[in-house]
Amino acid sequence: MAGPAFRAAAVRVRVPATSANLGPGFDALGLSLGLYDDVVVRVADSGLHIDIAGEGSETLPRDERHLLARSLRTAFDLLGGQPRGLEIVCANRIPHGRGLGSSSAAICAGIVAARAVTIGGDGKLDDTALLELATEIEGHPDNVAACLLGGFTLSWMEGGAARAIRMEPADSIVPVVFVPGKAVLTETARGLLPRSVPHVDAAANAGRAALLVEALTRRPELLLPATEDRLHQEYRAPAMPESMALVERLRADGIPAVISGAGPTVLALADEASADKVARLAGEGWAANRLSLDARGASVLPLAA
């Protein structure tokens, strides 16, 4: 059987940063942020060439070990076969190892680009299959769901398959991220979590996660109580004490703040009136960035955009 046909023209994919957990929504809730990696992929006659600019340009591999390349290969297998060669250009703006979904962005960029460059790819790999594939590669759906769908997402596993719904966050919310200079490996942060937690803590988080859906979509004034967490942040504090100290300081000032994903970035959910002031609160050692909310998720764009 003949393999798939590929487009001669390059495709450009833009993928957003994401913040998972958002306090109580451990491994379930995700928010898409207006900070992007751009990837251009072109089918070539032979070989694999990867060019990287920006974040990770000095450390990321430029061969088949690159997560983007591995994700492309996995998607091409599902689409019916591999191209003879690939040229990949990455413009990375999402910090690596900081809890802003850089690995999910690479995975989503790879599988979306593979579908886009394959003629008839949409019919072979629909959006549901994209989410399932991204989750299979990443290991959990919270970041990849937000990266693919944009907005505010709730994801879960059902019968071994990833599922997600997208909601529209309140447009008055202005995310502010505080990025430290030192990375924390996701594996390190996950390794600090206990095998079990007290029932009272699990019950409290369930209530707060439910409240957070209402707060993020309709009633931002409830974000401070809605972002309270008992399941993971305190357990991870030994790996990121400065981050937890900043979260506690911001919350004491009435600002909804959480560890972003597995950390160590801190995410504050401000509004237009307070965002600039909030961004100045971190002090030395932090890169504070006021961001927008992303509504599009992973997108195929014109090369000149």
From Swiss-Prot:
GO terms for cellular component: cytoplasm. Pfam families: GHMP_kinases_C (PF08544), GHMP_kinases_N (PF00288). Its EC number is 2.7.1.39. Pathway: Amino-acid biosynthesis; L-threonine biosynthesis; L-threonine from L-aspartate: step 4/5. It is an enzyme of class 2 (transferase). The keyword Kinase applies. It catalyses: L-homoserine + ATP = O-phospho-L-homoserine + ADP + H(+). GO terms for biological process: threonine biosynthetic process. ATP binds at residues 95-105. It is found in: Cytoplasm. NCBIfam families: thrB. Belongs to the GHMP kinase family. Homoserine kinase subfamily. This is Homoserine kinase.
